[in-house]
């Protein structure tokens, strides 16, 4: 049988999602817990491999198993064997044709900036602190040139293994809640560090160091060295993965935490 799971995790204590030798990964911890419940070795496939320090509230995985368990056992039982910073949010038996990665039509990320002169100890690791009072409206306007199917070479990490820099951005919204600025971006897929590289350059616009038109210019140059430094992994969350309705994948409120859609100033598409 094939099982899909919704996964939430705090990435601060992990060297990314993907299993690696001699370092902790989210994938390894989840596979160990699932293997305990299934009484057999479990290999999982995820919708999106997040980097070291990046968190997820809407990750989706699937695995195949010979074990027959009720859905609640895959959720509650697995959670009992996971560390506190990883949790199963839902479990569902899916059709054989479902694949967590290849069946997905889009991924959605949110990047959280905390704009305050002094940093916060409580929020450390969950947000990126910015001592400047950024202009969220200018950041939003600057980001609109990135919509649609385009070449994102200027926002692509040098070590990116993708065969093409072309991606299709469905929406990019920048909103403010008090001292928090939320960059919300959805695309069919992302090149390596794409969200963090975009946010790094949007910060330059929000700080007044570059004009709104700078983002369009960067996009046209297709040169990563001309864009701003990569934003930190702190504050980046994989919040949703979109699938065709036929798979009936469960949906949860878009996070993280208090940042549900209804609380944002700008309606999200």
UniProtKB/Swiss-Prot annotation:
E.C. numbers: 5.4.99.12
Residues of the active site: 51 (nucleophile)
UniProtKB keywords: Isomerase, tRNA processing
Pfam families in the cross-refs: PseudoU_synth_1 (PF01416)
Keyword Membrane listed: no
GO terms, biological process: tRNA pseudouridine synthesis
Binding site for substrate: 109
Coiled-coil zones: none
Record's function text: Formation of pseudouridine at positions 38, 39 and 40 in the anticodon stem and loop of transfer RNAs.
Protein name per Swiss-Prot or TrEMBL: tRNA pseudouridine synthase A
Origin species: Haemophilus influenzae (strain PittGG)
């Amino acid at each position: 049988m094939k099982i899909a799971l919704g996964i939430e995790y705090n990435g601060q204590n992990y060297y990314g999602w993907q299993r690696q030798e001699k370092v902790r990964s989210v994938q390894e911890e989840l596979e160990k817990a699932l293997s305990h419940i299934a009484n057999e070795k479990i290999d999982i496939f995820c919708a999106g491999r997040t980097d070291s320090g990046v968190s997820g509230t809407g990750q989706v995985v699937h695995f195949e198993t010979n074990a027959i368990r009720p859905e609640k056992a895959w959720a509650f039982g697995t959670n009992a064997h996971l560390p506190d910073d990883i949790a199963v949010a839902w479990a569902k038996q899916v059709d054989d044709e479902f694949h967590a990665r290849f069946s997905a039509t889009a991924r959605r990320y949110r990047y959280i900036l905390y704009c305050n002169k002094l940093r916060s100890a409580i929020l450390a690791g969950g947000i990126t602190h910015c001592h400047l009072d950024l202009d969220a409206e200018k950041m939003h306007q600057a980001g609109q040139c990135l919509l649609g199917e385009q070449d994102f070479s200027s926002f692509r990490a040098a070590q990116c293994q993708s065969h093409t820099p072309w991606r299709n951005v469905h929406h990019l919204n920048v909103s403010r809640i008090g001292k928090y600025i939320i960059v919300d971006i959805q695309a069919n897929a992302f090149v390596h560090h794409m969200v963090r590289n975009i946010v790094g350059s949007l910060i330059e616009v929000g700080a007044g160091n570059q004009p709104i038109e700078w983002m369009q210019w960067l996009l046209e140059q297709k040169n990563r060295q001309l864009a701003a430094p990569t934003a930190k992994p702190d504050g980046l969350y994989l919040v949703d993965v979109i699938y065709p309705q036929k798979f009936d994948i469960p949906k949860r409120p878009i996070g993280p935490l208090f940042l549900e859609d209804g609380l944002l100033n700008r309606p999200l598409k």
